[in-house]
């Protein structure tokens, strides 16, 4: 089960996660026992029932569940334990993975956990950001439940949850989260998530967005670049060609964030989430943090310009 095809991470990455997360898991478990006891332990250290699974097994089980969407019953049969043990294992390890945040390229040990952290990092390092929204299909709520229509996406005509993805110009994931119901438009999320406020606080940060964030580009024309509006039907051929070329260059510059979203969809729960809706945010952040670890290891390369350059100087 520890093979990368099952757990989605390399063996080196798995070893790093074991070293990083095992102390946090032990502290979390001991804190829970202390709260249940209402005080310090009464018996000697090591007394009481022993764990059926080591932390290595627990981490691998959680990674396999996140990567493949394998059911808890199937994992219980593979490890010869009960389904409740698997459920408790995932419930203990998944929050620790979700709390890790997002790795930063060329900055080992530094993690980003909020949109404010991302904008502060981009401002300090001069990083150009790319923003996009992502949708994940979720289960349909029961009939008669309040707010049932809030999750029906106008684009996909399905029950979805939307999130915001932020990457650099190489498609390396810097942030993914800020979940919202699928019916909410991207421009509405700009106001509710505080993205517009971050652009006001960091006027030197620039970003490339799609047409869903065109209102943000209108509010911050010097910072945000969105696809140009299509000319009217009676526009001349030259104007239409100029519009198509401008749209192509802008799309080419921001395609990297689409690649970051594609990396997320390689994990089964990000294609269709079948679990409880209140655990989606935790699952999403855990998966996105693991993807950012791998993306941060990609070396930084020079950002090529998409501007047109004349092949011959015609001014002479």
Named regions from a protein language model:
Residues 54-69:
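Short, amphipathic alpha-helical "recognition" segments used to contact nucleic acids or chromatin
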Residues 23-27, 67, 92-95, 99:
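Short helix-loop boundary/capping segments at the starts of domains
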Residues 53-54, 249:
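Residue-level marker of regulatory loop/turn positions in helix-turn-helix DNA-binding domains and
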Residues 1-53, 215, 299-308, 313-316:
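Charged, often Cys/His-bearing segments associated with DNA-binding zinc-finger transcription factors
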Residues 74-98, 102-316:
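Short, well-ordered secondary-structure "scaffold" segments embedded in the functional core
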């Amino acid at each position: 089960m520890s093979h990368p095809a099952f757990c989605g991470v390399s063996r080196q990455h798995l070893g790093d996660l074991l070293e990083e997360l095992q102390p946090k898991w032990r502290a979390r478990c001991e804190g829970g026992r202390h709260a249940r006891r209402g005080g310090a332990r009464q018996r000697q250290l090591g007394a009481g029932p022993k764990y059926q699974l080591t932390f290595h097994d627990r981490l691998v089980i959680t990674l396999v569940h996140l990567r493949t969407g394998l059911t808890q019953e199937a994992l219980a049969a593979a490890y010869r334990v009960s389904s409740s043990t698997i459920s408790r294992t995932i419930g203990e390890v998944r929050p620790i993975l979700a709390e890790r945040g997002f790795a930063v390229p060329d900055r080992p040990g530094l993690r980003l956990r909020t949109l404010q952290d991302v904008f502060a990092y981009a401002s300090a390092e001069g990083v150009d950001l790319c923003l996009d929204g992502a949708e994940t299909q979720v289960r349909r709520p029961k009939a008669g439940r309040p707010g049932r229509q809030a999750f029906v996406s106008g684009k996909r005509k399905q029950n979805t949850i939307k999130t915001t993805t932020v990457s650099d110009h190489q498609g390396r994931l810097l942030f993914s989260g800020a979940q919202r119901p699928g019916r909410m438009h991207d421009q509405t999320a700009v106001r509710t998530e505080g993205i517009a406020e971050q652009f006001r606080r960091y006027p030197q940060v620039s970003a490339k967005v799609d047409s869903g964030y065109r209102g943000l580009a209108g509010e911050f024309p010097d910072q945000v670049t969105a696809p140009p509006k299509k000319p009217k039907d009676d526009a001349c051929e030259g104007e239409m060609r100029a519009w198509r070329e401008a749209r192509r260059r802008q799309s080419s510059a921001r395609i990297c964030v689409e690649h970051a979203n594609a990396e997320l969809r390689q994990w089964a729960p990000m294609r269709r989430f079948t679990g409880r809706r209140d655990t989606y945010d935790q699952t999403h952040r855990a998966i996105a943090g693991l993807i950012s670890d791998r993306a941060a290891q990609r070396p930084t390369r020079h950002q090529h310009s998409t501007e047109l350059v004349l092949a011959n100087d015609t001014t002479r």
